[in-house]
């Protein structure tokens, strides 16, 4: 969320005191801030990165604990939303390992992108890695799964749309080629649509020494 969005959500004034509060949380490692491209101007986005706080706010805060509560929540929509958010955060915090898995020697810029092309078609990309040396932009799609990730017909079309929209946007460096990287828990399942992905990265890659 942006500073203005956070201020609105909390009911606090988005002034100097609020800015100082965000800076203290950033310096302590509780949140991170990063640029979000795609809008008319670059926005600074703040994200909670403390894993315990993410769990506490989702499952403990304002919830009366009772026997069997966690078992009842397992594999519910609430559980999968939390798992998806924390897996995406895990990937963001392991950028050097992702870079190694993709065999990228240097990353000149990394960011999330949410924008439109000149025709007004929109798309959101979890993470873009720009590599000037290889003249390549890696469009990273991050997906939590409990087995090898299988690409459906709809998801295949969604990935191709993201590639097309980003390619036609002002963010894309026209001298760079584009490649799609899927970062998932257990890797990519080979099927009729798996060829849309150029690179597959798994949890094993994130924790490789």
Give the predicted meaning of each segment.
Residues 1-125:
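Accessory nucleic acid-recognition modules appended to NTPase machines
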């Amino acid at each position: 969320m942006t500073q203005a969005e956070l201020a609105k959500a909390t009911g606090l004034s988005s002034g100097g005191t609020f800015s100082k509060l965000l800076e203290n949380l950033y310096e302590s490692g509780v949140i991170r801030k990063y640029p979000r491209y795609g809008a008319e101007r670059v926005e600074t986005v703040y994200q909670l990165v403390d894993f315990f706080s993410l769990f506490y706010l989702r499952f403990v805060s304002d919830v009366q604990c009772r026997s069997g509560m966690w078992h009842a929540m397992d594999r519910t929509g609430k559980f999968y939303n939390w798992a998806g958010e924390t897996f995406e955060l895990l990937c963001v915090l392991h950028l050097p390992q992702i870079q190694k898995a993709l065999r990228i020697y240097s990353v000149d810029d990394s960011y999330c992108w949410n924008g439109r092309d000149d025709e007004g078609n929109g798309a959101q990309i979890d993470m873009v890695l720009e590599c000037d040396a290889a003249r390549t932009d890696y469009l990273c799609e991050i997906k939590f799964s409990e087995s090898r990730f299988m690409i459906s017909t709809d998801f295949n079309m969604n990935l191709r749309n993201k590639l097309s929209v980003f390619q036609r946007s002002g963010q894309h460096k026209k001298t760079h080629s584009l490649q799609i990287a899927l970062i998932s828990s257990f890797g990519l399942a080979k099927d009729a649509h798996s060829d849309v992905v150029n690179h597959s990265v798994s949890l094993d890659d994130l924790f490789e020494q």
